[in-house]
UniProtKB/Swiss-Prot annotation:
UniProt-annotated location(s): Cytoplasm
This protein's encoding gene: argH
Keywords (A to Z) from UniProt: Amino-acid biosynthesis, Arginine biosynthesis, Cytoplasm, Lyase
GO molecular function terms listed in the Swiss-Prot or TrEMBL record: argininosuccinate lyase activity
Entry similarity comment: Belongs to the lyase 1 family. Argininosuccinate lyase subfamily.
Enzyme Commission numbers on file: 4.3.2.1
Pathway(s) of this molecule: Amino-acid biosynthesis; L-arginine biosynthesis; L-arginine from L-ornithine and carbamoyl phosphate: step 3/3
Highest taxon in the source lineage: Bacteria
Biological process annotations from GO: arginine biosynthetic process via ornithine; L-arginine biosynthetic process
Pfam families in the record: ASL_C2, Lyase_1
Catalytic activity: 2-(N(omega)-L-arginino)succinate = fumarate + L-arginine
CDD domains associated with the record: Argininosuccinate_lyase
Name of the molecule in the record: Argininosuccinate lyase
C-alpha cells in the first residue's frame, strides 16, 4: 500500500490524503513549464493590478503582491529559485513562494482566476513571442537568399524535374524560389500573430466570474489587442499552439528540401556548392571527408517538428469542453518544435551566406541532358509555325539522333537536323545555348536575369515592410 501523504495545500481542502508517488510524477509539469515563468509573472502582475483597480483587493495587498512577484522573477533569473515537483507546475511554485515572501496577501492573487485561464494566457504570451522571433528569423533567411540571388542572377545552372535535367535556369532564380517559399512562411506567421492576439485571462475555470473584473484592462496590459469573447472556448482552445506547429511544419518542409539540395549539390558528383569548415565536419576514419552535417541535421530536425504537430493533433482530437489534463501535454511539443525551428532557420541562413558557388560546374551541367530541347521545340513553333505537338515530336527525334551520336543538340549538323525537318535553318543554332535559353524566359516570374532582378526588387521592398 502506498504511503499516505498530506494533500496539496493549493487544492487539497477536498482531499484527506496526498497523491501516490507515481501520481505525483505523472501529474507534475514543472520540469518543462518552468519555461513559462516570465509569462506567468507577467500575467499575475496584470491580474493583480486589475484586481486593485476594480476594488476587488486592497491597494496594500496589491503592492505586496507586485513586489513579491518581482522578487521571485529576480530569484529565477539569478538561478536562486528552488522548483518543487510536489507543487506540480510553475503557477503553484510561484504562488507558494509568494506566500513565503508576503504571507496571507498572496492568497488574494488568485481571486477571479483559475489555473485554466492562467495557463492559457501564459502559453498564448509565450507562443506569441515565439512567433515574433520566428518572423525575425525568417526575414533574416530571406535577406540571405536575396543577397545570393542578386549575386547570381545570371549564373546558369540546370533546372530539374524528377531530379533529371529539365531546362536551364539561373542560380538566382533558384534562390528566389526559396524566397517565395519562406515568404509564404512569414505570411503565415503574421496571420497567426493576428489570430493569437486575444487574451483569455479572466475566463476563470470555464464560465467566467462573478467578480467585477476588467478583462479589457488586463488584455491591454499584456499587449493583446482584445480579450477573448467566450470563456468556455478561452480555456478549451489550443488552436494557437496547433497553428504554430502547423506553420512550423510547413516551414520545416521547405528547410528540409533546401537541406537536401545542399547535401546533393555538395557531393563531388554535382560539385555545385561548397560549405566552409564552419558548417561541415570530418570523419573519424576517412581523413579526406568533409561532411555537410549542418544541412543533414536541419533535414533531421524538421522531422521532429512534424512529429510534434501530429502529437498535439492527436492529444486534442477527442477532448470534450472545457479543460482536460491531457492539455498539459501541449507544451513540450511546442517548446521542442520552437527550439528546433529557430535553430534550423538560423543554421540555414548561415549556410546560405556561407556557400561557395561553383559557377563553372553549374554552367557545364546546365548544358547536359539536352536541356535546350524545349528551346528547339519553341523555335519550331515560332519560326516554322509548327503545332507544338508536332514540334515536340520533331525535337524528340533530334534528341534521339544526338543521343545515338553521343553529342549535344547544338553539335548536330544542319544537314542532320534537316534530315528530320527540311525547313530547319542555321538560325536555330543561336537558340540552343544555355545563355540564350535563360535570357529568352522573360515571362513574368521566369528565369531570365532581368526578370530575376525584378523579383529581387519586389522582395526587397516587401521584406522592408514585413
Amino acid at each position: 500500500m502506498s504511503e499516505q501523504k498530506s494533500s496539496n495545500q493549493m487544492w487539497g481542502g477536498r482531499f484527506a490524503s496526498g497523491p501516490d508517488a507515481i501520481m505525483e510524477e505523472i501529474n507534475a509539469s514543472i520540469g518543462f513549464d518552468r519555461k513559462l515563468y516570465a509569462q506567468d509573472i507577467q500575467g499575475s502582475l496584470a491580474h493583480a493590478a486589475m484586481l486593485a483597480k476594480t476594488g476587488i483587493i486592497a491597494a496594500e495587498d496589491h503592492k505586496q503582491i507586485e513586489n513579491g512577484l518581482k522578487t521571485i522573477r529576480k530569484e529565477i533569473e539569478e538561478g536562486k529559485f528552488t522548483f518543487s515537483r510536489k507543487l506540480e507546475d510553475i503557477h503553484m511554485n510561484i504562488e507558494a513562494r509568494l506566500a513565503e515572501l508576503i504571507g496571507p496577501a498572496a492568497g488574494r492573487l488568485h481571486t477571479a482566476r483559475s489555473r485554466n485561464d492562467q495557463v492559457a494566457v501564459d502559453f498564448r504570451l509565450w507562443v506569441k513571442q515565439e512567433l515574433e522571433k520566428t518572423a525575425a528569423a525568417l526575414k533574416n533567411l530571406i535577406e540571405a537568399f536575396l543577397e545570393r540571388a542578386e549575386e547570381h542572377a545570371a549564373t546558369v545552372m540546370p533546372g530539374f524535374t524528377h531530379l533529371q535535367t529539365a531546362q536551364p535556369v539561373t542560380f538566382g532564380h533558384h534562390c528566389m524560389a526559396y524566397v517565395e517559399m519562406f515568404g509564404r512562411d512569414l505570411s503565415r506567421v503574421r496571420d497567426a500573430i493576428e489570430r493569437i492576439d486575444e487574451s483569455p485571462l479572466g475566463a476563470a475555470a470555464l464560465a467566467g466570474t462573478g467578480f467585477p473584473i476588467d478583462r479589457h484592462m488586463t488584455a491591454k496590459a499584456l499587449g493583446f489587442r482584445e480579450p477573448t469573447r467566450n470563456s468556455l472556448d478561452s480555456v478549451s482552445d489550443r488552436d494557437y499552439a496547433l497553428e504554430f506547429l502547423s506553420l512550423a511544419a510547413i516551414c520545416a518542409g521547405h528547410l528540409s528540401r533546401l537541406a537536401e539540395e545542399i547535401v546533393i549539390w555538395s557531393t563531388p558528383q554535382f560539385n555545385f556548392v561548397r560549405l566552409s569548415d564552419a558548417f561541415s565536419t570530418g570523419s573519424s576514419i576517412m581523413p579526406q571527408k568533409k561532411n555537410p552535417d549542418a544541412a543533414e541535421l536541419v533535414r533531421a530536425k524538421t522531422g521532429r517538428i512534424n512529429g510534434s504537430l501530429v502529437a498535439l493533433l492527436t492529444i486534442m482530437k477527442g477532448l470534450p469542453l472545457a479543460y482536460s489534463k491531457d492539455m498539459q501535454e501541449d507544451k513540450e511539443q511546442v517548446f521542442d518544435a520552437a527550439e528546433n525551428l529557430e535553430l534550423a532557420i538560423a543554421a540555414m541562413a548561415g549556410m546560405v551566406r556561407d556557400l561557395t558557388v561553383n559557377v563553372a560546374a553549374m554552367k557545364k551541367a546546365a548544358g547536359s541532358g539536352y536541356s535546350t530541347a524545349t528551346d528547339l521545340a519553341d523555335w519550331l513553333v515560332r519560326t516554322l509555325g509548327l503545332p507544338f505537338r508536332e514540334a515536340h515530336h520533331v525535337t524528340g527525334r533530334a534528341v534521339a539522333l544526338a543521343e545515338s551520336r553521343k553529342v549535344d543538340l547544338a553539335k548536330l549538323s544542319l544537314e542532320e537536323l534537316q534530315s528530320i525537318n527540311p525547313a530547319i535553318t542555321a538560325e536555330v543554332f543561336g537558340y540552343l545555348t544555355v545563355e540564350k535559353s535563360v535570357k529568352s524566359r522573360q515571362s513574368f516570374g521566369g528565369t531570365a536575369p532581368q526578370e530575376v532582378r525584378r523579383q529581387i526588387r519586389y522582395w526587397k521592398k516587401r521584406i522592408a515592410k514585413a
